[in-house]
Structures are given as structure tokens and as C-alpha cells.
Amino acid sequence: MNENIAEKFRADGVARPNWSAVFAVAFCVACLITVEFLPVSLLTPMAQDLGISEGVAGQSVTVTAFVAMFSSLFITQIIQATDRRYIVILFAVLLTASCLMVSFANSFTLLLLGRACLGLALGGFWAISASLTMRLVPARTVPKALSVIFGAVSIALVIAAPLGSFLGGIIGWRNVFNAAAVMGVLCVIWVVKSLPSLPGEPSHQKQNMFSLLQRPGVMAGMIAIFMSFAGQFAFFTYIRPVYMNLAGFDVDGLTLVLLSFGIASFVGTSFSSYVLKRSVKLALAGAPLLLALSALTLIVWGSDKTVAAAIAIIWGLAFALVPVGWSTWITRSLADQAEKAGSIQVAVIQLANTCGAAVGGYALDNFGLLSPLALSGGLMLLTALVVAAKVRITPMS
């Protein structure tokens, strides 16, 4: 029955791709991600200006992720049948307002309020991004459209911190956020001009969000999503101490490694649609298996700089398949409830990121330098096994 509903949902899709709207969504995503991580490179001047410690200033990133998790869970219940075009415009306005509130913040409270606004937009936008994409392009083009959106994410992750640091030294941290607000205005204009009307789901399609987990293979999919992202953050959060102490990279060398990782991630995302067209399940099982082998290689031969640098590139290429692949899984296997599935997915990812980083840090402090790698590799291997054995992928119609 669920398959029949999904097939009908896909059959009602668009006949021709609306690439202008897809790129508008991608631009909004890139701006959201960039602003999310701007404080990472601006903590010191922000803390000094507001008279707080850098640790306290760092909570401006934490509160964004925390609010985003709850926003992703409840946004579809709140917006219900509202035209998604207006919702995306609202998120772009919230992005702009957040930047301005942070720019003019004269207290830590106002700073957190501004960052909470960003969390609302970030979580809500991610929750509906997959369903938006599948309504802007034909079913066969969805992986390509998703690769465009996640390619924008990769670019934002590469440039956010260095760009913020560079501009902050020239124009000051407040003007960096003013510049980001201008980007938010551009988001609003582009979305208004390019995004068509996208009515909310009809009442007969409404279903309790968590009842989706009772569908065959869905709970297994969410567990696999959790393990893959927890595995990523268990290692990547601590890549600096691992690479500097295990492989002996200095700061400049580590910068090049991270840049290589970012470029590889962008390349992997750009070509992910070609892999996913052949087999979504193979990509979702093969990528974490390759990452598990990469973690094992680092544990055994990571003291060699060449090996360590090569693994960073392989890791960036392989993990790039993971977010695009799971979003494609939602558009294929949960097409009739893509928004609610996206809400659960985003919340699971946010929780996984937090747990992965926390457990990885505990392991590093208590079990040694290689323990985050072992934890990450183990989680990636389990992910591959769960996907191969339990996750179902609906064939493309």
C-alpha cells in the first residue's frame, strides 16, 4: 500500500526540471551553512567585544544546532498545508534577521536570540529540503538536483571559516554578519522570483510522524543514518589532534589536509548523482564500508604523512555520498511522506553529530589517540551491515 501511495506521489511530479528554483534552494542552503559556522572563526573578537569568554561565545554555535534539532522535528506539524514557497521565503527572512541581530548584539542574550533564529531556519529548511527538491524536478533528476544542493553545502563548509577569519580581520566581526545579512536579502529575492507555488500536503496524506518508523526498513534506515553521522563526527571532530600527533602534521600541513578534504567532498558530491543512479543501496553500503577500511588504514599506517593525506581525500570523496544518498532514499522510499521523513532525518543527524563528538572526545581522553578512529570505523562497518541487511530502497519509477 505504501509503495502505491509513493508511486502516485511521484507520478504527480513535475515534467520538466526547474533548475533556477533548485539553485535558489542551493544558494539558501549555502548561506545558512556559512552563517552557522561563521562564529567558529570569529570567536575571539566576538568574546572580547561582548565581554565574555571564548567558551561562552562558542555556545552561539551550540544553541543553533540545539534549536535546529527541535525545529526540524516540529516544523511540518506547524506549517501543515501552508504553501512551501512562503515557508522558504520565511526561512530566508529569518536568516537575514539572525545576521542583523547578531551584528547589533550588545549582550550575550541578544546574541543567543539571533542564533536561535538561525536554528529555526536551519532545521526547518533541512527538514523540507528533500521534499522541495522532488517537487522541483522529475523523479529521475532528483539525485542530480540533490547533488547540486549538497555541493553548495560542501562549498559553504570549505569557505565559511577561512572567509569569516579573513573578512573579520579587515572589516570586523559585526560587518561580517552585516555582509551575511546582504546574502540573506539576495536569498529572499531569488526565492521570490524563482520558486513556484508548492502547496502543503493534502489532509488525506497526513500521518503521525513517528508512525513512519513502523514501515519496513525505515527504522533500520534511521539507525544507519545515526551510526554513519556519529561515526563521521567521532573522527572528524578530532582530526586535528589525530593528524598532528599521529602523522606529525604542523598547522600549515593540517590546513592543506583539511582543504584537500573539502575539495574532495565537493568533487564527491558533484559526482554522487552518477553513482546513485546505478544503485542507491550500493552507495549507502559501500561508502561506509570504504570509510571503515580507511579508519583501519589510518590506525595501522597513519604515521605516514602520505597515507594520512590520501585517507583524508578518500574520506572526503566517500562520505560525500552519505548525505546525498540518504536524502535520495527518502525521495524514493518515503515519497508520500518526504517532509515528515526529512524532519526525523535531520533530528537524527543532529543527535548523531552531538553523540559522535561527545563519545569520540571521551574516547580520546580516556583510551588514547587511536580510539576515535576505532570508534568511527566500527560505526561505519555496522552501518554498511545494517544497510545491506535491513534497508529497503524503492526502485525508481
Curated annotation (Swiss-Prot):
Gene Ontology MF: a single term: antiporter activity
Topological category with respect to the lipid bilayer: Multi-pass membrane protein
Name of a matching Pfam family: MFS_1
Any one cellular-component term (Gene Ontology): plasma membrane
Keyword Cell inner membrane listed: yes
Subcellular location: Cell inner membrane
Catalytic activities: inosine(in) + H(+)(out) = inosine(out) + H(+)(in); guanosine(in) + H(+)(out) = guanosine(out) + H(+)(in)
InterPro entries assigned to the protein according to its UniProt record, in alphabetical order: MFS, MFS_dom, MFS_Efflux_Transporters, MFS_NepI, MFS_trans_sf
Keywords: Antiport, Cell inner membrane, Cell membrane, Membrane, Transmembrane, Transmembrane helix, Transport
Entries under HAMAP family matching the protein: MFS_NepI
Family to which the UniProt record says this protein belongs: Belongs to the major facilitator superfamily. DHA1 family. NepI (TC 2.A.1.2.26) subfamily.
Function: Involved in the efflux of purine ribonucleosides, such as inosine and guanosine.
NCBIfam families linked to this entry: PRK10213.1 (NF007578)
Protein known as: Purine ribonucleoside efflux pump NepI
Naturally occurring in which organism (per UniProt): Salmonella paratyphi A (strain AKU_12601)
